[in-house]
Amino acid sequence: MSGRRRNHPGRLASIPGLRTRTGSRNQHPGIANYPADSSDFRPAQQRRALEQREQQAGQLDPARRSPSMPSANRYLPPLGQQQSEPQHNSAPPCGPYPGERIKVTRAAAQRSREMGYRMYWMVQRAATADGADKSGLTALTWPVVTNFAVDSAMAVALANTLFFAAASGESKSKVALYLLITIAPFAVIAPLIGPALDRLQHGRRVALATSFVLRTGLATLLIMNYDGATGSYPSMVLYPCALAMMVLSKSFSVLRSAVTPRVMPPSIDLVRVNSRLTVFGLLGGTIAGGAIAAGVEFVCAHLFKLPGALFVVAAITISGALLSMRIPRWVEVTAGEIPATLSYRLHRKPLRQSWPEEVKKVSGRLRQPLGRNIITSLWGNCTIKVMVGFLFLYPAFVAKEHQANGWVQLGMLGLIGTAAAIGNFAGNFTSARLQLGRPAVLVVRCTIAVTVLALAASVAGNLLMTTIATLITSGSSAIAKASLDASLQNDLPEESRASGFGRSESTLQLAWVLGGALGVMVYTDLWVGFTAVSALLILGLAQTVVSFRGDSLIPGLGGNRPVMIEQESMRRAAAVSPQ
């Protein structure tokens, strides 16, 4: 490099403390960023000396002094601005010391810590909004998020075994067998969960915690039977444990539904509460929990030949059990509550000779039958849940039938899963902002949309229409569920809402199980599977529409009942009172 180039003023002007040809050693370090040859932009010392000489000569008016002009570089101070001396205080400096250079890793750590703090307080504010921390809703939110995270981590843990290792025919037959073994007890127990909780004065929190503890044991059993060489599990252990985990997750949903009305803040309704819980579960559980499980699974599988996602499942379930016991104690109080019932019978005016029997019935426990709008919404939601359960299992076996490698199969399932997640999130986001004045009408429309999309998928029989049907079904399911919650809140007295919410959730889970069983047993051609599920959806849609019109295809379980029904024993008491 020549001496002329080394001493170029444009090169040295930006280096503090160096002398240039046109400036002194004490020039402003950013002199090159200012216009040249202008007295208004001279360094401060030169300008003050010039002003003093002009004042002494009487040539400068003090009022005409121009202020310091801004710099063209926004990171530099004005040229004439005096830099104040740093004030010494006892607080430690926040930034680096003069001359200290921040490393990339240190800057990234500081930035990550700052973003973590902001994210934590943002989530905390959202979780405690509307008085949720005082009502107990915040304490229930974290177990719900944990349950979503367990489902997501379990899906990551079993993705390799179910979609890479197992043969198609073998996996389908074994899943069908173990589905029968595990789902059949759930189908018997689920209708009894609500009445059992109505009779228990204590035990809701313990039941929620137990659903997590049992899943901890199942995850531990899978870890103990993991074969690191092949990356698989014995079939006699894998399928019962996987399906039992699914059943326990559904049981948690039923148990949670009986607790939610007891922790509802007075400033928001049940629809907003459930939408908030679902959004928290999707963001914090499904997305964040699934990402963490996928990262741990990748590291442990490649470095230690261990099922890392199952260790995440075990850790999350232990946390869920502890968080469930932190729910406030007042969710256990059931004094004054009246259980709800799905059935309803039209009772004619009793004859005089049957009056003693009616008096005996009046002396029994009070019950609250569900009204017409609730029954209509429940039938519509059950119809949609059949489709949701079908889409949960059926695409997996369809993907296995294609002669493609595991990554292609996983990509097909990822596309359908993404559509389901987007639809669910959009449906909950929309339902929280809808004015649900006529919820039964909205449920009927959602049921029609799902049935039409199922018929379209059966005609098209391709992946694109299946993805669209999944998207619409997930969104419609969220909106219909919010409409059902609105019907329960509007048409039931306060002392029966918790019981009615639990009974409805049990019924919805049974419908989901029916759809999942159909997805396992039907032939793995898209048009065949969607034709079979469309037949069920048409029957459910017919019952929904008939119930909406005040009639029923099934005696005692349709819409041939009033919109608002009095408590059963009170109505009978009025009917049999002596004239």
Swiss-Prot record:
Gene3D superfamilies: MFS general substrate transporter like domains (1.20.1250.20). The keyword Transmembrane applies. It is found in: Cell membrane. GO terms for molecular function: transmembrane transporter activity. Keywords: Cell membrane, Membrane, Transmembrane, Transmembrane helix. One of its GO terms (cellular component) is plasma membrane. SUPFAM superfamilies: MFS general substrate transporter (SSF103473). Its main location: membrane. It holds the Pfam family MFS_1. The keyword tRNA-binding does not apply. It comes from the Bacteria. This is Uncharacterized protein ML2143. The lineage of its organism: Bacteria, Bacillati, Actinomycetota, Actinomycetes, Mycobacteriales.
